[in-house]
Amino acid sequence: MNGEQKKSTLLGPAVRRLQKELQRLVTSPADGIKVSDETCNASDLTSWKVDVTGPKETLFEGENFQLSFQFDEKYPFDSPIVTFTGDNIPKHPHVYSNGHICLSILTTDWSPALTVHSVCLSILSMLASATKKARPPDNFLYVKTCSKNPKKSSWWYHDDKV
């Protein structure tokens, strides 16, 4: 973070909360979670890139993925938009080929107590629980018809075993 104060288009509680979360992720990163250098050097807190590595002894062991977090002024009372980005989007039954993630804590089960760190851990746990590398059965149709914002999708959470 270079000790510089981050500039942001966010106000008040969102800025303070994000500064605190970023500081924690930079100084005390969890295994498999690293804030990208791009985020650490950014002048705006509304967009983060977080690099995650597939957990040991899982189908995704050692694979590197990037998550995009988009925050607005309602954070932490409203969830961020979280998607996989880049060339390596995991083939997982709850991850669409456009990077959208079907995970209830990103929408209906969001709580202000959740953090970027806890969201990343939940996503890594989701990856770790996979029993096969495959796209969701409706991937083609969903990707063709969905909004760019996954929070606008009407998710149907029905399968916690993959």
Model-derived features: where do they sit?
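Domain-scale recognition of soluble eukaryotic interaction modules
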Residues: 1-19, 25-26, 51, 64, ...
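Eukaryotic beta-rich interaction modules
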Residues: 27-34, 44-51
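Short, ordered beta-strand-loop transition motifs
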Residues: 36-45, 95-97
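Conserved, non-catalytic sequence blocks in retroelement Pol enzymes and Pol-derived host proteins
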Residues: 37-42, 55-59, 110-115
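Conserved catalytic and ligand/cofactor-coordination microenvironments
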Residues: 55, 73, 86
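Proline-anchored loop/turn motifs at beta-strand termini and strand-loop-strand connectors
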Residues: 70-79
